[in-house]
Curated annotation (Swiss-Prot):
It comes from Arabidopsis thaliana (Mouse-ear cress). It is an enzyme of class 1 (oxidoreductase). This is 6-phosphogluconate dehydrogenase, decarboxylating 2. Forms homodimer. Forms heterodimers with PGD1 or PGD3. Pathway: Carbohydrate degradation; pentose phosphate pathway; D-ribulose 5-phosphate from D-glucose 6-phosphate (oxidative stage): step 3/3.
Length: 486
């Protein structure tokens, strides 16, 4: 038990909570911790002792936990989103006082954060919704943090988060005050949506290299390790290289080949796609990555479908195509990078659309800066995004930034070769294909949408605009078409 009041408290000691608490303590801030399951409290206290006698103090009941923290109190919650958050707030509120601050560090739906901020304000409490990215390793050694809500609440923890967040040599701590309301949770949600896209694109690169190029796991390990030294340098490419190098400890071969091809999810990707639809922001790369996870979940159905089509002469790979491995690796690298630009462009445009709708005033370049370290999507590429928004804060789309436009033009031939090769081989590349379609649609001055609008006017009298005259028009297409047939 702490003799002096601690600087901060943390409730919820699953992996993320434990590691963040230890990180805070290691940075010199005495911390009180609490969990409903008391064994987790004892486990965390024991870890603190083993990891350097850190100033971390455990409590088995909420009252003594709250009262151990210096005023105005700051308590971070890291519990499952939804009703567990409401229950934790209710439990803690019984002992909090006016001016105390609650910080939700989980992946919460942004409107829940806004609701809770208003609700606790009635008791005089402050509230923050703070996205935390980086997984268990990031939480322990320095995550990217996205706090939004009460600015006064943020100032109460600013000294802590500036030290606890990941530190990037050329751009500082990976944390900033995001904005009002649920902006912090919304930004973290879209971060996760971009993460879905990134992971899917990397998986497709792997599939093409393995299924068409016949690269071994050793070769894949080498390729991804090389990629991580260039424009694709990132956490996800780094861990992908690691994965290909790990042997199975329960049998022969590599572990990656024994992992069931069925991807789980926790909901933030789905939320991102739903918000994109609600705001009419095209996000096909992120959407396709979500659909890919849904399809992966249909494992039993896919097993049966494979039998049906194999009986009809369709194997996993339609044709074995002779390819130049070196050329293929280079083409796939370029296709992955170009697709990645599209995925980030979609995510940034979604954040901007929500910021405009809610009046948050979010700075997209600053978001790219705090994602450069600690988080799952951290990448050297984010420096380029920050520079793009520094050049033009009103940039309509990353695709039309002069530097990114030049890079896409240089890579688009390789991008098309990879997508065509995959299609001809019967390999699905939904992320790369969707990214390419997004690019081709966005760069074309005229799309076939004129025909779709004409059809809508034909059957529903929805009217249309003309290219040569201002105004709204309706044509009796059916009547004219029938008269012309007489």
């Amino acid at each position: 038990m702490a003799v002096q009041p601690t600087r901060i408290g943390l409730a919820g000691l699953a992996v993320m909570g434990q590691n963040l608490a230890l990180n805070i303590a290691e940075k010199g801030f005495p911390i009180s911790v609490y969990n409903r399951t008391t064994s987790k409290v004892d486990e965390t206290v024991e870890r603190a002792k083993k990891e350097g006698n850190l100033p971390l103090y455990g409590f088995h009941d909420p009252e003594s936990f709250v009262k151990s923290i210096q005023k105005p109190r700051v308590i971070i919650m890291l519990v499952k989103a939804g009703s567990p958050v409401d229950q934790t707030i209710k439990t803690l509120s019984a002992y909090l006082e006016k001016g105390d601050c609650i910080v939700d560090g989980g992946n919460e739906w942004y409107e829940n954060t806004e609701r809770r901020e208003k609700a606790v304000a009635e008791n005089g409490f402050l509230y923050l919704g703070m996205g935390v990215s980086g997984g268990e390793e990031g939480a322990r050694n320095g995550p990217s943090m996205m706090p939004g809500g009460s600015y006064e609440a943020y100032k109460n923890i600013e000294d802590i988060v500036l030290k606890v967040a990941a530190q990037v040599r050329d751009s500082g701590p990976c944390v900033t005050y995001i904005g009002k309301g649920g902006s912090g949770n919304f930004v973290k949600m879209v971060h996760n949506g971009i993460e879905y896209g990134d992971m899917q694109l990397i998986a497709e690169a792997y599939d093409v290299l393995k299924s068409v190029g016949k690269l071994s796991n050793e070769e894949l390990h080498s390729v991804f390790s090389d990629w991580n030294k260039g424009e694709l340098e990132s956490f996800l490419v780094e861990i992908t290289a690691d994965i290909f190098g790990i042997k199975d400890d329960k049998g022969d071969g590599h572990l990656v080949d024994k992992v069931l091809d069925k991807t789980g999810m926790k909901g933030t990707g789905k939320w991102t796609v739903q918000q994109a639809a609600e705001l009419s922001v095209p996000a096909p790369t992120i959407e396709s990555s979500l659909d890919a996870r849904f399809l992966s979940g249909l494992k039993d159905e896919r097993v049966q479908a494979a039998k049906v089509f194999k009986a009809g002469g369709f194997g996993d790979i339609l044709t074995d195509q002779k390819v130049d491995k070196k050329q293929l690796v280079d083409d796939v690298r370029k296709a992955l990078y170009a697709s990645k630009i599209c995925s980030y462009a979609q995510g940034m445009n979604l954040i901007r659309a929500k910021s405009i709708e809610k009046g948050w005033g979010l700075k997209l370049g600053e978001l790219a800066r705090i994602w450069k370290g600690g988080c799952i999507i951290r990448a050297i590429f984010l420096d380029r995004i920050k520079q793009a928004y520094d050049r033009n804060a009103e940039l309509a789309n990353l695709l039309v930034d002069p530097e990114f436009a030049k890079e896409i033009i240089e890579r688009q031939s390789a991008w098309r070769r990879v997508v065509c090769l995959a299609i001809n081989s019967g390999i699905s590349t939904p992320g790369m294909s969707a990214s390419l379609a997004y690019f081709d649609s966005y760069r074309r001055e005229r799309l076939p949408a004129n025909l779709v609008q004409a059809q809508r006017d034909y059957f529903g009298a929805h009217t249309y605009e003309r290219t040569d005259v201002e105004g709204s028009f309706h044509t009796e297409w059916f009547k004219i078409a029938r008269q012309s047939k007489i």
